[in-house]
C-alpha cells in the first residue's frame, strides 16, 4: 500500500472534530477543599492544550482519544448553567455525530462525575469512576493502567495536585501508553470563583510540559516551582494586610522550596530590609550578588518605585556586599 493510500485511510478513520490525543488522564475533586483538577500524560505533543479543561466553581473536563475539544468548552458551559457532569456528558455524547472514538470524563463542583469510552477507542482502553474522581486511558500497554491510577490516587497523600501526580505515576508504573511518553499537564482550580480566572487567582496550579523525554519528572519540577510562586503570592497578600511575620514566613518557604529561583531570595531579602531586619537580609544579598551581580542594579531601582527605603546609607551598605569587579 502506498504512503498516500495509508494517509487517506488514516484520515477516514480519524474521528471528526479534532486531533488525536491518545493518553491517560484523571479528573478529581478534593472533598475537603472542593478544589478540582485534571492531569494528563500522553505520547502526543502539547497534550494539555486540548485535553484538560477547568473552571473554578464549575468543574473540570478531560477530552481525549479522537479528541473533540468542544467537549471541554461545551461541558463547562452546561455545568455552569447547573447541569450535572453526568447529564452534561450524556447530552454531548448524544449530540456527537462521531462519538465512537471519543473518551471523555467530566466532574462538577458538587463532585458528580462521569466518564465515557467509545467502542472504537484504541485498546487497551477503559475508565474507572470512583468517589469524586474518574481515571481514563486508551492505547495503553494493558488494561491494568486505569485501575492502577485509581489505586494510586486513593492511597496518595498531600494536596490535590500531589494526588493527581500520584495517579499519573501509577499509570506509568503499570505500563502507560504503548507508544511511550512526550507531554503532560496538570490544572487545579478553586472550589469557588474569585473572579480572577488566571494562575494566582482561580487557578491554583496550571503547568504544562509540551515535549520532554520524561514528562512526569518535568511536570513535578514545574509544579514545585509554581507552588513556590503560590507562597510568594500569598506573602504579597499578607504584606498588603500588614501581617508582616506571616508574610516573611511564607516568603521564606517560597525561597527554600525553589532555591534555584534567585528572584525569590531577592524579594525576601528586600522585604526584610523594608521591615527593619537588615541584619537578616545581609547574608542573603551577599550570596545573591555573588551569584548574579545584576540584582544590585535591580535593587537600586526599587526606591523610585516605592519598594525599598530611599536611604543612601542603606544602599551604600548593600553595594558593599557585591563582589569587587
Where are these regions (language model features)?
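Alpha/propeptide regions of enzymes that mature by internal proteolysis
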Residues: 9-179, 210-243, 256
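Short coil turns that delineate tetratricopeptide repeat
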Residues: 259, 293-294
Amino acid at each position: 500500500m502506498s504512503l498516500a493510500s495509508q494517509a487517506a485511510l488514516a484520515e477516514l478513520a480519524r474521528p471528526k472534530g479534532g486531533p488525536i490525543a491518545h493518553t491517560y488522564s484523571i479528573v478529581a475533586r478534593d472533598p475537603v477543599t472542593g478544589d478540582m483538577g485534571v492531569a494528563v500524560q500522553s505520547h502526543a505533543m502539547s497534550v494539555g492544550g486540548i485535553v484538560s479543561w477547568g473552571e473554578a466553581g464549575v468543574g473540570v473536563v478531560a477530552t481525549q482519544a479522537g479528541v473533540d475539544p468542544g467537549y471541554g468548552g461545551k461541558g463547562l458551559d452546561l455545568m455552569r448553567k447547573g447541569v450535572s457532569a453526568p447529564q452534561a456528558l450524556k447530552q454531548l455524547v448524544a449530540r456527537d455525530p462521531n462519538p465512537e472514538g471519543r473518551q471523555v470524563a467530566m466532574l462538577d463542583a458538587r463532585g458528580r462525575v462521569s466518564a465515557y469510552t467509545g467502542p472504537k477507542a484504541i485498546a487497551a482502553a477503559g475508565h474507572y469512576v470512583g468517589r469524586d474522581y474518574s481515571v481514563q486511558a486508551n492505547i495503553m500497554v494493558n488494561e491494568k493502567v486505569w485501575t492502577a491510577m485509581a489505586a494510586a490516587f486513593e492511597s496518595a497523600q498531600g494536596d490535590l495536585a500531589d494526588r493527581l501526580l500520584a495517579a499519573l505515576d501509577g499509570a506509568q508504573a503499570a505500563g502507560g501508553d504503548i507508544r511511550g511518553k512526550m507531554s503532560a499537564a496538570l490544572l487545579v482550580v478553586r472550589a469557588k470563583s474569585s473572579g480572577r480566572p488566571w494562575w494566582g487567582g482561580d487557578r491554583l496550579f496550571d503547568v504544562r510540559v509540551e515535549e520532554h523525554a520524561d514528562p512526569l519528572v518535568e511536570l513535578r519540577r514545574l509544579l514545585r516551582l509554581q507552588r513556590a510562586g503560590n507562597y510568594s503570592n500569598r506573602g504579597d497578600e499578607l504584606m498588603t494586610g500588614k501581617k508582616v511575620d506571616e508574610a516573611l514566613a511564607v516568603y521564606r518557604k517560597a525561597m527554600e522550596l525553589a532555591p534555584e529561583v534567585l528572584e525569590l531570595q531577592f524579594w525576601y531579602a528586600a522585604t526584610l530590609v523594608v521591615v527593619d531586619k537588615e541584619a537578616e537580609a545581609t547574608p542573603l544579598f551577599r550570596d545573591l550578588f555573588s551569584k548574579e551581580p545584576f540584582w544590585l542594579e535591580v535593587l537600586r531601582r526599587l526606591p523610585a518605585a516605592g519598594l525599598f527605603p530611599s536611604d543612601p546609607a542603606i544602599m551604600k551598605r548593600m553595594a558593599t556586599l557585591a563582589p569587587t569587579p
